[in-house]
Amino acid sequence: MSKWNRKIWAAILVVGMTASLTACGGSKGENSNASAAGTQNETATVQDESTDSNTDSTGSTTSLVQDNRVLQIPDDNYRTYYELFVYSFYDSDGDGIGDLQGVLEKLDYLNDGDDTTDMDLGINGIWLMPVMPSVTYHKYDTTDYENIDPQYGTLETFQELLTACHDRGIRVILDLAMNHSSSSHPWFQQAAEYLKSLPEGAEPDSSECPYVDYYHFSREYQGGYAQLDGTAWYYEARFWDGMPDLNLENEAVRREFEQIADFWLDM
């Protein structure tokens, strides 16, 4: 039993004993009255101490009435992240599609930057689902890895949002789809055009078109492959034919993504 509970029960028992002595001890005269009065004083003292403070096992005393301590958030990677799909979060311009300006306008709902308030969610991290240019609503089929989809806004708006988040102690994670690109990405488009231009039976040469090695092409159909329109070639596309898988074993592809990562991390 905690010290707080012991004090409450002690107070209840003392009050009960005092009431019994008062009811039964009327004939005992002044001594009984003095005893009861002394007991009542002790009860009041115990109740006052129990109401004002509580002492823990370390000997420190904390208020049970009001706690004015400010929330202390450790500076580590264990945070409360809010996964945010911009498309459906908040539309700031009335076009029916959520945007980065909408996220900026509703940032106080997520975290108002004041640890003493309790009207916000109090998150300290945002995981932004893909925000880069794409031909679909979900934006996982990227057409440009170093820009913002026009439906969502501009790089300037993103930078403004990033600054506002950092001012509130919010960290931002970008969902960067590196496993595949869009079939509309210039890399894939150039590789496709090159393959279409090859004479029948000719093998592709990466020195003529380096992007042909950015993806997995094959003359034979395999599971998870889609046919390249207008050719006898197939390409790996595990999700769907609009998202061709990238060849991450290719050093050139890895260097591309090192540069892309630096672009966003340097903002």
Predicted features by range, described:
Residues 20-23:
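C-terminal motif of bacterial Sec signal peptides marking the signal peptidase cleavage site
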Residues 1-2, 26:
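Non-catalytic effector/regulatory segments
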